[in-house]
């Protein structure tokens, strides 16, 4: 065997072993369970009920809509107040809270998709307890478009029982 042939065989063997078998296949996960990041920010402006939040460490400024502010208990927020923010792996804001409230009031519901509203308003799940319908947060709605009926999912719900995130599989 020549030196070039050995070199080619060794290179091919390394490439075959280095590339995982499913590298070309898309992931089944929409968002991993541990992919949430919590940080705080300061409200710099409130305009027409919209909260504008400045965050440290060069992170992009955030906004909280009037509907979300009411739902998460920030309807009496003031400029200069520090609040906690929770984002998913796609850097999308999924929850906000005053600093005296943490995020452990989230709950998870597992089931199969029975119906996902094309306008992202609600999702229906078949669970062992029966069919359940949940309102969908406006920022989480785009995740519904990739969920076919019958797909096994786990929904993450906030304290108001609104879907804020979805995870494929159970």
Describe the role of every protein-language-model region.
Residues 2-8, 12-15, 19-63, 67-131, ...:
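Short, flexible, surface-exposed loop segments at domain boundaries
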């Amino acid at each position: 065997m020549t030196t070039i042939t050995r070199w080619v065989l060794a290179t091919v063997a390394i490439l075959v072993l280095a590339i995982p078998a499913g590298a070309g296949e898309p992931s089944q996960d929409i968002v991993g369970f541990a992919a949430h990041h919590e940080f705080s920010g300061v409200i710099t402006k409130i305009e027409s009920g919209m909260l504008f939040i400045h965050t440290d460490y060069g992170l992009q400024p955030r906004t909280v809509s009037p509907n979300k502010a009411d739902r998460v208990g920030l309807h009496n927020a003031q400029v200069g107040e520090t609040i906690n923010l929770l984002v998913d792996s796609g850097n999308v804001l999924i929850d906000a809270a005053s600093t005296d409230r943490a995020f452990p009031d989230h709950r998870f519901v597992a089931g199969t998709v029975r119906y996902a509203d094309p306008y992202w308003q609600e999702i229906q799940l078949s669970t062992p307890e029966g069919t359940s319908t949940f309102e969908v947060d406006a920022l989480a709605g785009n995740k519904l478009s990739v969920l076919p009926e019958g797909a096994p999912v786990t929904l993450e719900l906030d304290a108001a029982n609104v879907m804020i995130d979805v995870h494929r599989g159970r």
